[in-house]
């Protein structure tokens, strides 16, 4: 505790500017002034405190501020729900409905939705801060399987945990 893990993650994800040193990602020095800049560069962050809107659907949360639009500039809900369903299927959690309200999802399902949101941004690096702190042992195993799947797909994972057995998995 107190070693600067969260501060480092916030710098990498564009929440805070570094006061010293540099951030190099994919061989290039980066200066992110916002999380959206880090996201555009391929870095996504999942905070320990989930950042989902409980009154919105799973798909609306995944594509918040990036909802697909049609030629008239209106939200293309059909595409959004289909794209979200495909992402949920890819992660092996197709039992979560893209139309489900987040308030009706369990904590572990919300955590999986946060991962889905990061994957939807084509993240090359996924920063996870204590992702299992409120999950059961069964849910932890499932989440770690998804993390390993993402690693196999070439996504870098920065996984912060106080549980050493998770890090060694």
Which positions does each model-derived feature cover?
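Glycine-rich phosphate-binding loops of nucleotide-dependent enzymes
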Residues: 1-169
């Amino acid at each position: 505790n107190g070693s600067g893990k969260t501060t480092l993650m916030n710098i990498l994800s564009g929440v805070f500017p570094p006061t010293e040193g540099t951030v190099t990602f994919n061989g290039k020095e980066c200066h992110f002034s916002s999380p959206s800049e880090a996201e555009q560069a391929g870095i996504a962050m999942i905070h320990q405190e989930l950042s989902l809107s409980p009154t919105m659907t799973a798909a609306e949360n995944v594509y918040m501020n990036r909802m697909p639009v049609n030629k008239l500039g209106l939200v293309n809900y059909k595409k959004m729900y289909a794209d979200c369903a495909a992402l949920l299927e890819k992660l092996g959690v197709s039992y979560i409905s893209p139309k489900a309200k987040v308030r009706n999802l369990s904590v572990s399902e919300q955590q999986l939705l946060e991962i889905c949101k990061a994957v939807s941004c084509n993240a090359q690096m996924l920063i996870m801060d204590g992702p299992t702190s409120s999950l059961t042992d069964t849910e932890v195993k499932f989440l770690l399987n998804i993390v390993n799947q993402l690693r196999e797909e070439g996504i870098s994972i920065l996984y912060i945990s106080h549980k050493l057995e998770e890090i060694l998995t």
